[in-house]
């Protein structure tokens, strides 16, 4: 492998790693989007997922009727649907940290159920200072059409 290809591969890996950290590792909000789940676990989301480049693994399991447990990059997260109108949000809580903060993520599953796309909410649009779920919901509704609301996409393919 020549040096430019090696540099490109390392940059691609760093980009994927940063996206993953943004989606799950950046748990920075004090409260979930909604105080309780808005729907039950979706069966098609359960399973093992691998990032498009094959370097990142995400395991999604049912914890309770309406709650998931996620294993990603050695960390555990609890997640549940926090849908707002037509937008499929998920409140993701970091279970490894003492402060147990939340990340806000929107997801999309391909029609064939083989590709899961995640995007985290941009904290420059939705400030970390939001202290209650009602104000979070209001801000998300207010910014629903704001193209800056979400970060870059991160895609995972379902393992067989």
Each PLM stretch: what is its role?
Residues 2-14:
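Bacterial N-terminal signal peptides that target proteins for export
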Residues 23-26:
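C-terminal motif of bacterial Sec signal peptides marking the signal peptidase cleavage site
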Residues 28-44, 52-160:
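Calycin-type beta-barrel ligand-binding domains and close structural analogs
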């Amino acid at each position: 492998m020549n040096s430019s290809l090696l540099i490109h591969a390392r940059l691609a890996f760093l980009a994927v790693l940063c996206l993953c950290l943004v989606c799950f590792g950046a748990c920075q909000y004090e409260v979930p989007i909604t105080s309780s789940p808005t729907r039950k676990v979706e069966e098609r989301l359960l399973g093992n997922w691998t990032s498009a480049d094959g370097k990142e693994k995400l395991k999604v399991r049912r914890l309770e009727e309406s709650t998931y447990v996620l294993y990603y990059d050695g960390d555990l997260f609890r997640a549940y649907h926090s849908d707002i109108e037509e937008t499929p949000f998920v409140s993701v809580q970091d279970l490894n940290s003492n402060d147990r903060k939340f990340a806000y993520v929107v997801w999309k599953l391909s029609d064939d159920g083989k590709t899961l796309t995640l995007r985290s909410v941009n904290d420059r649009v939705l400030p970390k200072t939001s202290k209650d779920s009602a104000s979070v919901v209001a801000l998300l509704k207010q910014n629903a059409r704001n193209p800056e609301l979400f970060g870059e996409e991160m895609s995972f393919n379902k393992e067989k």
